[in-house]
Amino acid sequence: VAPNKPMTLVVAAVVVLVIGASAAVLYGTSNADQYVSELDQVLTEPDTPSVVIECGTNEERHLNADNPVVSPGIPFGAHHTHEYVGNKSADARSTNDSLAAAPSTCEKGDLSTYYWPVLRLTDRTGHDAHADGGGLHGNTGEVLKPKSVEIRYEGSPVSAVLPMPRFVRLITGDPSAFTNDHGPNTRARWGCADKPGRYTTKYPLCGSATTLRSYDFGSCWDGNNTDSASHRTHVVFPLVGGACPPRTFPIPRLHVTVGYDIPAGRPFAIDSFAEEMRDPATDHAMFINVMPVALMSELVRQLNGSR
């Protein structure tokens, strides 16, 4: 028996290599460990009043490689492609005035813009294979259309909320999470519709269930500013338990959930900066509040009245 052991080890090693290579091919990346079947994190959130704003699923395919929050005035400044719902004019040239004058896909007169990186099937050729934000920046594949988009505003679990200031700009998540070693701004949350309350920072393999991307934004405002150099310090996240840090004030908490039907076994990945290697932990989203003051006041009334 002993003479056969080396051959057994060789065969086993070959099998492992073949399986690993197959996974890499299947998922369109050399980082096959970015894909998981188990959602290893449990979501625990307090029950709070909420209001949903219907904004569609980007049926008109409003896509661009701009970022009006982080890189205003710079066409293709995102170096990856964003998907938008809400304000139909949002791009690098957007100003407060142009956004306030534009139409929107949202109901109730909400002119806000909500956007995040596109998700792609990487075994297909994309429409932008030779364009900025697409193939020229390493983001290859066919853009997947969302099955669902939920825009939800939530109240505070511990107090009444104040209205969001109009034209406040927010970002959640870290588009540089990979090179930042998954630091404190990483807030990627991937899940499956058939596993509520569980999530992962990796790509989930949901089988026939809808794949979900969720974004929670900060909800503690400094009381003065609609933006900051980092696009983060003027509105921060609440403390454990839901109270805002000192010298900040509770505003409605924006929660966005995007769902996709991904055929089982098909490779997929989000857009990212080239150096971020399309790591799922780099998922992020941006928002500019362009709600008319009266609509925001009514939203706050509903959130506070349900307490």
Predicted segments with their positions:
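N-terminal cationic amphipathic segment used for targeting or macromolecule association
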Residues: 8-11, 21, 30
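N-terminal export and membrane-targeting signals
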Residues: 1-14
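Hydrophobic alpha-helical membrane-insertion segments, chiefly the h-region
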Residues: 16-28
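Primary mode marks residue(s) on the alpha4-beta5-alpha5 output face of response regulator receiver
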Residues: 28-79, 83-215, 222-307
